[in-house]
Amino acid sequence: MITSGATQALTLVSKLLLSTGDEVLIEDPITNDIQTIFKNSGASLYPIPVDDNGMDTSLLPANKHPKFIFTTPSHQFPLGGALPIQRRVQLINYSRKTNCYLIEDDYDSEFRYEGSPVSSLQGLDPERVIYI
């Protein structure tokens, strides 16, 4: 599907997937605009702290059953970290275990100043990842 941008894509995904009370795991920090999109669809947000390597997957909660997880793995916004392949695999395994989707906003993935590009989450699990 082609949209006018990430905001429209996230709004459409939220309207399609979310019902009042559904849980969404988000990176912390993340923009207020993204939080508002999910809240407007009735979601309860659960923030996962971010470090220099993106979302800290060791902190994914065992007691939550999210509808989806929102992440910016190639260039975490606003801090800029890139999620290493080990964490990407952990995130995919968690989504399989909890039967949730991963919403991958591949913001700035094409801009690399060092090293080879890291595989997108969607490339690692195309059936579970919604790629924006």
What are these regions (language model features)?
Residues 1-99, 110-111, 116-130:
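Conserved core of the PLP fold type I
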